[in-house]
């Protein structure tokens, strides 16, 4: 052993390649040992070692002598355990263990620590107990893999479903948010969105949304419904025929005292009757087939199959009898007046009962429900019958001999306002005309009315709350108050006191000037009243109430509670649907009292038969004033001037005439607002057009434009767009027009009507002569204005805007390098003081813009 170790010490260490080769040889030897058995294993190992030594010696001779001879190991001297384990002692620094591990070889080796080897999932585990065990283990591993794969798939699916649910909830929240902004409430009306799309002209989008399959499915469902309906009708007809046959059989059954022979003979007769009926039904069906088909057109006239109009049998009978033909609607009226229409009387009685039941249950709690019920009755019955029925019931409920509860009057007037807005304005007009006619009749005989009779008081209260809920305008109520004040007595004072107590503060709020005029008129009437009336306590109390309303002192009014009426107004607004609102009727007292003579102009399609002389005189007056009415009341010179200025639309012509004929800019502003124009750009166009065509700059147009800009932002945008149009078309303007435009913009910009950024459409990189002249005029007028604080505020507003970096740099460049040139300053012909002031302000503005940019 010492000899071997001595040689090994002299041997050179093996290289990596040689070590790997040696390791593979050891593996082969161990395999041979395993298959050779236990008897001759040592001999085979020794022979293998000798063969290995010989091969290594041959290979070493062939190579260059790079290293010393390898050490020769005698296998007889190596222990068996060391040989089987593949571990050989040597003096080498590196030794590579054999990775060959076998179950039977490990069993022969002495006990040692076994390291647990964790193999990755899916790697086949080697088994030596048999092929069946190995296959079972492989199946178990495969099942485990499939189970784990399914678990992963289920988890991923659940996660995906959860994510989709979260996204759907986010989409629903976003949709609800947008629906809320668009005021679409699905809970109120599910088909409202589709109806909105049809109203907005977007119904064609539904054709793109509905594909062919859905249309086909809908068509099939429609066909199935038709088929089911047809089968049901056939069954009903069959049931009717069977019932008739059973009734006939019951009638034809023989009595108990009849004999069987008689019953048999009767049965034969029944068979004969049945055959006769079948023949008759066949003949009737043939006659029906041969009969000409008659249809009604949209006008109610009967036409045959070829389209010819058939004569009316009633008209033929009347002509044959030599009588005058009476139209159907007049026949119905004559029959109703004569009392021959029992069916109409039954309808009116039933309608009266239904309306009375609804009105008896009317209260603030169920106001919406009762209003919807009466609206439904309006849809099912004629409006004439409904108006007459409701008028009769409301007069019975509210216009009694005793004083009516004020809350009850308010609830009924809210109902009228709802019907006026939801069904039609002619309903409110009908009730207003009825109540005003009653009021006029009571006022004419007011001196004979007893103080205990409260019918006029109740009627005045009804008219007051009709005004409070905006059924008619303030002018009519002022006329009614004037009619009461003209005939001062104890009853009229009581009615005036009732008006001031109920809606006095509302009158003062709606039109203070009209209320002041009315109050002065009433006070003058009181001053001229007789002494007996002046000493009346009711009159003194009315004067106190009038002064309290004048001074806006609500505490002096006894039992004054405006909250109930205000709550009812809010409830009315909430009850109205489909963008409906109460249309306020602007009718005068004379129009209502003479409606039977001159007609109801406030109702569309209303006609009348009045005095022909009055109609002729009215026609003559109309011919005389036709030019004035056609021209809107403007002078011919103004209209000719508007035509020359190319005011080619009615809106522009009216705006132009108002601007030219107004007393001042406030008067022009109010008159233009009363036109209720939807196009704000027309106002801006006309004002700028007039400003440009003046000989010299007129500040009137700038003040008027500033008034509109401060009134609504829509007008501010309209003036901005109109200014941009003029700046973009500046080559079409003359120098006086450019000066007027610069003066107009300078005044509006300094007053904060428009921002300085209105000039951002000017291309500073390619300034032509006219654009340069325009910018020079604007900037010089801005910088030399009197109020220095307004100048700096104008530029500061632009300096704070971070989106206008390029515009601010362009303004700085224009001011420093173009405006302050000696040549340009000489052209301006400024005084030395103005030149220094201009230089000073330009430097300050340049620093302001530069500082904010930093």
UniProtKB/Swiss-Prot annotation:
Residues 88-105, 242-289 have a biased composition (Acidic residues). GO terms for molecular function: RNA binding. Residues 1-38, 55-105, 120-161, 217-306 are annotated as: Disordered. One of its GO terms (cellular component) is nucleolus. Its main location: nucleus. Residues 60-71 have a biased composition (Basic residues). Residues 15-28, 135-156, 217-238, 290-306 have a biased composition (Basic and acidic residues). It comes from the Eukaryota. It is found in: Nucleus, Nucleolus. Keywords: Nucleus. Pfam families: MA3 (PF02847), MIF4G (PF02854). Residues 352-553 form the MIF4G domain. GO terms for biological process: ribosomal small subunit biogenesis. Residues 650-764 form the MI domain. InterPro entries: ARM-type_fold, CWC22_splicing_factor, Initiation_fac_eIF4g_MI, MIF4G-like_typ-3. Belongs to the CWC22 family. This is Nucleolar MIF4G domain-containing protein 1 homolog. It comes from Drosophila melanogaster.
């Amino acid at each position: 052993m010492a000899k071997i170790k001595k040689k090994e010490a002299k041997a050179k260490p093996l290289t990596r390649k040689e070590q790997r080769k040696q390791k593979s040889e050891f593996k082969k030897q161990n395999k041979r040992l395993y298959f050779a058995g236990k008897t001759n294993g040592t001999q085979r190992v020794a022979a293998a070692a000798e063969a290995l030594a010989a091969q290594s010696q041959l290979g070493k001779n062939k190579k260059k002598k790079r290293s010393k001879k390898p050490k020769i190991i005698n296998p007889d001297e190596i222990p068996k355990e060391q040989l089987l384990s593949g571990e050989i002692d040597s003096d080498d620094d590196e030794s590579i263990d054999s990775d060959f591990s076998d179950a039977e070889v490990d069993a022969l080796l002495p006990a040692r620590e076994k390291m647990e080897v964790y193999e990755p999932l899916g790697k086949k585990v080697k088994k030596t107990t048999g092929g069946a065990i190995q296959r079972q283990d492989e199946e178990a591993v495969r099942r485990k893999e499939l189970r784990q794969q399914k678990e992963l798939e289920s988890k991923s699916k659940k996660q995906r479903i959860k994510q989709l649910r979260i996204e759907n909830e986010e989409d629903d929240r976003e949709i609800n948010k947008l629906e809320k902004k668009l005021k679409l409430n699905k809970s109120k009306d599910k088909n409202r969105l589709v109806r909105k799309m049809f109203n907005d002209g977007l119904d064609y989008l539904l054709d793109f949304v509905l594909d062919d399959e859905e249309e086909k499915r809908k068509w099939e469902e429609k066909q199935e419904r038709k088929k089911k309906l047809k089968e049901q009708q056939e069954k009903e007809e069959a049931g009717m025929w069977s019932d008739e046959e059973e009734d006939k059989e019951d009638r034809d059954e023989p009595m108990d005292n009849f004999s069987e022979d008689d019953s048999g003979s009767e049965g034969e007769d029944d068979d004969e009757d049945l055959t006769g009926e079948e023949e008759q039904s066949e003949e009737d069906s043939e006659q029906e087939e041969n009969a000409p088909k008659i249809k009604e057109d949209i006008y109610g006239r009967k036409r045959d199959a070829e389209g010819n109009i058939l004569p009316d049998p009633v008209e033929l009978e009347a002509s044959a009898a030599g009588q005058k033909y009476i139209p159907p609607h007049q026949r119905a009226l004559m029959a109703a007046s004569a009392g021959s229409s029992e069916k109409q009387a039954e309808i009116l009685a039933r309608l009266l009962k239904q309306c009375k039941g609804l009105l008896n249950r009317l209260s603030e709690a169920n106001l919406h429900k009762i209003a919807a019920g009466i609206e439904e009755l309006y849809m099912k019955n004629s409006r004439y019958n409904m108006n007459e029925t409701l008028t009769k019931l409301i007069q019975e409920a509210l216009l009694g001999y005793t004083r009516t509860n004020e809350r009850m009057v308010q609830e009924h007037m809210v109902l009228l306002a709802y019907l006026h807005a939801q069904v039609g304005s002619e309903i409110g007009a009908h009730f207003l005309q009825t109540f005003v006619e009653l009021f006029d009749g009571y006022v004419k005989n007011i001196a004979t009315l007893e103080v205990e009779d409260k019918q006029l008081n109740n009627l005045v209260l009804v008219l007051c709350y009709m005004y409070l809920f905006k059924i008619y305008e303030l002018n009519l109520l002022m006329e009614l108050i004037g009619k009461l004040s003209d005939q001062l007595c104890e009853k009229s004072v009581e009615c005036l006191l009732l008006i001031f107590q109920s809606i006095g503060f509302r009158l003062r709020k709606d039109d203070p000037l009209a209320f002041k005029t009315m109050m002065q008129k009433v006070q003058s009437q009181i001053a001229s009243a007789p002494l007996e009336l002046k000493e009346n306590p009711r009159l003194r109390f009315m004067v106190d109430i009038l002064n309290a309303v004048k001074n806006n002192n609500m505490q002096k009014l006894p039992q004054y509670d405006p909250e109930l009426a205000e709550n009812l107004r809010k409830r009315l607004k909430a009850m109205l649907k489909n963008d409906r609102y109460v249309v306020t009727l602007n009718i005068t007292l004379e129009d209502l009292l003479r409606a039977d003579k001159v007609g109801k102009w406030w109702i569309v399609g209303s006609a009348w038969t009045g005095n022909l002389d009055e109609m002729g005189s009215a026609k003559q007056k109309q011919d005389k004033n036709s030019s004035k009415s056609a021209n809107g009341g403007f002078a011919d010179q103004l209209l000719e001037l508007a035509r020359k200025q190319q005011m080619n639309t009615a809106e522009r012509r009216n705006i132009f005439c108002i601007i030219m004929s107004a007393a001042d800019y406030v008067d022009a502003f109010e008159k233009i607002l009363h036109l209720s124009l939807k196009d704000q750009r027309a106002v801006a166009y006309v004002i700028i057009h007039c400003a440009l065509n003046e000989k010299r700059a007129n500040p009137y147009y700038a003040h008027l434009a500033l008034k509109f800009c401060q009134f609504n932002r829509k007008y501010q945008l309209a003036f901005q767009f109109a200014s941009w149009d003029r700046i973009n078309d500046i080559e079409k303007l003359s120098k006086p027009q450019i000066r007027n435009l610069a003066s107009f913009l300078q005044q509006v910009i300094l007053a904060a009507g428009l921002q300085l950024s209105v000039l951002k459409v000017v291309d500073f990189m390619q300034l032509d002569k006219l654009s340069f002249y325009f910018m020079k005029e604007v900037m010089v007028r801005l910088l030399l204005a009197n109020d220095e604080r307004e100048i700096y505020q104008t530029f500061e507003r632009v300096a704070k805007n971070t989106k206008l970096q390029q515009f601010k740099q362009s303004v700085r460049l224009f001011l420093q390098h173009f405006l302050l040139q000696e040549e340009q300053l000489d052209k301006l012909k400024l005084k030395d003081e103005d030149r220094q002031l201009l230089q000073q302000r330009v430097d300050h503005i340049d620093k302001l813009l530069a500082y904010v940019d930093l």
